[in-house]
Amino acid sequence: MIVLDTNVVSESMRPRPDASVRAWMDAQIPSELHTTAINEAELRIGVALLPKGNRRKDLLLAINTALARHFADRIVAFDSAAAVALADIVEHRRTIGRPISQFDAQIAAICKARGATLATRNVADFADIGLKLINPWSAP
């Protein structure tokens, strides 16, 4: 299982996604690509905070379409196993002097609880957690 972080999902929705990201995604088995409910929330919050108008409506439609088309049954929820992992991640990152944002900690916890790889551009944000990370912008 590969979990796509918000920046990867967002990039894939662009009219002209980065060539490296597109090539990396095309090389993956679609059924292995997932995202989380936390990533969905980040996307929806980003749109909800935009001024009302056509751009906001168009982006919301694009998110709804992308999630339904590409992740219909592959949006991973935050569950009890993730809650246990979350506590460990937050404690560890504070102990080493590198606090982590709540959303990133929740995404990392979901991945850790399921043994999933995380695909993200922000690899530094998820360092020192013990996750396998892939940066599609620089993947071979």
Q: What role is predicted for each listed range?
A:
Residues 45-51, 69-119:
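Active-site neighborhoods of divalent-metal-dependent phosphate/nucleic-acid chemistry enzymes
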Residues 7, 20, 84, 106, ...:
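Active-site phosphate/pyrophosphate-handling residues
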Residues 29, 71, 129-130:
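Short, structured coil segments at secondary-structure junctions
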Residues 9, 40-43, 83, 126:
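A generic structural signal for short hydrophobic patches within well-formed alpha-helices
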Residues 1-36, 48-66, 140:
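Short, well-structured N-terminal submotif of metal-dependent ribonuclease cores
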Residues 1, 106-140:
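Acidic, PIN/NYN-like endoribonuclease modules and their adjacent C-terminal/linker elements
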Residues 11-12, 24, 46, 86-89, ...:
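Residues that scaffold the ATP/ADP-binding catalytic core of kinase and kinase-like folds
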Residues 37-39, 79, 137-140:
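Residues at the C-termini of beta-strands that transition into short coil/loop
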